[in-house]
């Protein structure tokens, strides 16, 4: 069974490489998204249980999420296993270096989801019904990204700033993505706006309800392809 899934990954990689090469030949860069966490049943957790907060039976001791806020009164319980950051530190962040290296094999630019989790991450006891019982823990911070940069060189990274962004998170963004002397206003000139995210409906949904015919018609014509969207 493992060999079967390895073969599927091989075929996907083969086809994706052809697609990326073609896109790049047309002057198109591909932006890829990397989630900060992996799933409990992922190949990463299966092959490297010691890098995650798992017990002797590979059951999580704490899981990921975010605290209660204006979006949810009980917070968000994602359920992903958390990292043992001290183990990652002791190995020179090699797993993360390899992960980022492969991302840049797939994409030209990498967007890191939940970037604030590298500064502080929310830890929720395993088995909790909501995220309300969780607490903040300190993440690896700039140390991780310095290790990645030393191994891979300076790469193009987009840091997601969704959710509560503390001063320490903003400092982490400035320290890694920009030189220390970069003016604050230059930071915001380099921002990228996305029309949607994973928890939102696609942008076509509100467009279908627009009542201004010219704007609605022109934009819908632009984003539609054939009979689909």
PLM regions: where:
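Conserved, well-ordered alpha-helix/loop/beta-strand core segments that scaffold catalytic motifs
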Residues: 10-37
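Alpha-amylase-like alpha-glycosidases and glucanotransferases acting on alpha-linked glucans and related
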Residues: 1-13, 38-229
């Amino acid at each position: 069974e493992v060999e079967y899934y390895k073969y599927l990954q091989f075929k996907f990689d083969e086809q994706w490489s052809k697609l990326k090469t073609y896109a790049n030949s047309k002057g198109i860069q591909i932006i890829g998204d990397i989630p900060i966490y992996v799933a409990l049943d992922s190949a990463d957790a299966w092959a490297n249980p010691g890098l995650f907060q798992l017990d002797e039976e590979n059951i999580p001791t704490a899981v990921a999420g975010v605290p209660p806020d204006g979006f949810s009164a009980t917070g968000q319980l994602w359920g992903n296993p958390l990292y043992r950051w001290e183990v990652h530190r002791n190995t020179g962040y090699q797993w993360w270096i390899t992960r980022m290296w492969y991302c840049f094999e797939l994409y030209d630019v990498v967007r890191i989801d939940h970037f604030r989790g590298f500064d502080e991450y929310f830890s929720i006891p395993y088995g909790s019904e909501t995220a309300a019982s969780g607490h903040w823990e300190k993440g690896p911070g700039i140390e991780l990204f310095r290790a990645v940069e030393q191994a891979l060189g300076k790469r193009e990274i987009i840091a997601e700033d969704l959710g509560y962004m503390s001063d320490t998170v903003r400092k982490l963004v400035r320290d890694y993505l920009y030189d220390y002397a970069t003016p604050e206003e230059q930071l915001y000139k380099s921002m990228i706006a996305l029309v949607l995210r994973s928890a939102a409906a696609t942008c076509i949904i509100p467009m279908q309800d627009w009542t201004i015919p010219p704007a609605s018609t022109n934009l819908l014509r632009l984003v539609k392809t054939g009979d689909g969207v």
